């Protein structure tokens, strides 16, 4: 992996790296009222207890380079599964539902790891129901609560571009959502970058994880640990601002910016048959 002034090069693609040198300018751009996308992570509202405690050991940093190499060679990171299964980069548009869209993207990636290809979940419904149709922010644990209550339908039942409650009482939507309503989550320690990296790097059971970032006021999900330079690591993340964001919807957060106020590992999802 090489680093240039444009960011980190991965598989021939330049991924934007967000660190202390550019974060303030970066946030300023996306705080512009003319920007078609919103954030919506409310760190002041975060509560714990929506998942089990993190059950794994913290992997020593000296082992990270070998594990990064292991996942690259075996194409076994959550990101490899995400790409192979065609998991979509989601579009929250101007709704402050990043907390649900990031959670939904991580769910979709966990299904990819379970061998389900072509699945396209739509996070809008549980967010809309949970917030009573209001366009307001939230947090990852709240997303988990609403998904376990109502599920999350596929886009085939609730099209991606339907950003209203018109389909809430549709029977097909209800059936589709209930296929994806039992999510097992582990809560990682707040602001613990090593726990986040250990979750994603686990050699046997790597998991995608939501990243609620207080400095950004936004929630994304992490899919891969990368080495930005010798001894310096970051997290490749997937945003919910369409593929027009970053490189194919993704970017890299340096450690100082990937240290998340709320971190939820998606450990398992409800079993289902393959998508036809």
Q: At which residue positions do the language-model features occur?
A:
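General structural signal for secondary-structure boundaries
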Residues: 27-28, 39-42, 116-126, 130, ...
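Substrate-binding/charge-relay-adjacent region of secreted/lumenal peptidase catalytic domains
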Residues: 59-149
């Amino acid at each position: 992996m090489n680093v240039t002034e444009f960011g980190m090069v991965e598989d021939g693609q330049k991924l934007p790296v967000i660190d202390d040198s550019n974060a303030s300018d970066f946030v300023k751009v996306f705080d512009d009222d003319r920007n078609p996308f919103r954030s919506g992570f409310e760190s002041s509202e975060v509560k714990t207890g929506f998942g089990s405690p993190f059950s794994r050991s913290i992997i020593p940093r000296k082992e990270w380079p070998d594990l990064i190499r292991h996942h690259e060679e075996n194409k076994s990171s959550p990101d490899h599964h995400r790409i192979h299964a065609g998991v979509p980069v989601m579009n929250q548009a101007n709704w402050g539902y990043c907390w649900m869209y990031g959670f939904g993207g991580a769910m979709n990636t966990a299904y990819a790891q379970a061998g389900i290809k072509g699945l396209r979940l739509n996070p809008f419904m549980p967010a809309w129901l949970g917030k009573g149709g209001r366009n307001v922010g939230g947090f990852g644990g709240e997303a988990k609560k609403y998904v376990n209550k109502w599920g999350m339908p596929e886009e085939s039942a609730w099209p991606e571009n339907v950003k209203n409650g018109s389909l809430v009482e549709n029977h097909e939507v209800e059936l589709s959502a209930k296929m994806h309503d039992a999510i097992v989550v582990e809560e990682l320690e707040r602001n613990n970058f090593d726990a986040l990296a250990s979750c994603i790097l686990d050699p046997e059971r790597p998991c995608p994880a939501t990243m609620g970032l207080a400095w950004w006021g936004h929630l994304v999900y992490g899919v891969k640990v990368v080495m930005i330079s010798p001894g310096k690591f970051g997290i490749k993340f997937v945003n919910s601002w369409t593929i027009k964001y970053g490189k194919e919807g993704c970017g890299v957060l340096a450690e100082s910016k990937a240290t998340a106020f709320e971190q939820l590992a998606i450990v398992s999802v409800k079993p289902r048959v393959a998508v036809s």
